Amino acid sequence: MARKTNTRKRRVKKNIESGIAHIRSTFNNTIVMITDTHGNALAWSSAGSLGFKGSRKSTPFAAQMAAESAAKSAQEHGLKTLEVTVKGPGSGREAAIRALQAAGLEVTAIKDVTPVPHNGCRPPKRRRV
């Protein structure tokens, strides 16, 4: 029986002009995912995946680095224009949007899609530090 050779599939370079950047900014981390207009992922990055650990993940600088990293790999697919959707209350929201613009991508629209409960679940108790 012939041995199966280990061949990895190469990433196909797609020619996509416009896409959507989904920025999820929590109190602990910032995740930036860039998709095409149908929602298929092109690139993603997060503060934790770039090596930031602990409380450094939640900083605006970490969010900026995550957005730059995702933008760089999305530009390899030919991406030029972006719509941005921002979700969550974290500190890296504005920094990530600015980093996408600084990376050379044209931001056409910014939407805030943070889920707001209509008095659903009881929130966690307040921290006393």
From Swiss-Prot:
Q: Which cellular component appears as one GO term in the record?
A: ribonucleoprotein complex
What is any Pfam family matched here? Answer: Ribosomal_S11
- Domain of life from the UniProt record: Bacteria
Keywords of the record:
Ribonucleoprotein, Ribosomal protein, RNA-binding, rRNA-binding
InterPro entries hit by this protein? Ribosomal_uS11, Ribosomal_uS11_bac-type, Ribosomal_uS11_CS, Ribosomal_uS11_sf
Q: Does the keyword RNA-binding apply?
A: yes
Against PROSITE patterns, the record matches this protein to: RIBOSOMAL_S11
GO molecular function term, any single one: rRNA binding
Q: Where are the transmembrane segments?
A: none
Instruction: Give any single GO term for biological process.
Output: translation
State whether it acts alone or in a complex, and with which partners, per the record: Part of the 30S ribosomal subunit. Interacts with proteins S7 and S18. Binds to IF-3.
Q: In which family does this protein belong, per the annotation?
A: Belongs to the universal ribosomal protein uS11 family.
Q: What does this protein do?
A: Located on the platform of the 30S subunit, it bridges several disparate RNA helices of the 16S rRNA. Forms part of the Shine-Dalgarno cleft in the 70S ribosome.
HAMAP family, alphabetized: Ribosomal_uS11 (MF_01310)
What is the official name of this protein in its record?
Small ribosomal subunit protein uS11
This chain's source organism reads Listeria welshimeri serovar 6b (strain ATCC 35897 / DSM 20650 / CCUG 15529 / CIP 8149 / NCTC 11857 / SLCC 5334 / V8)
The taxonomy runs:
Bacteria, Bacillati, Bacillota, Bacilli, Bacillales
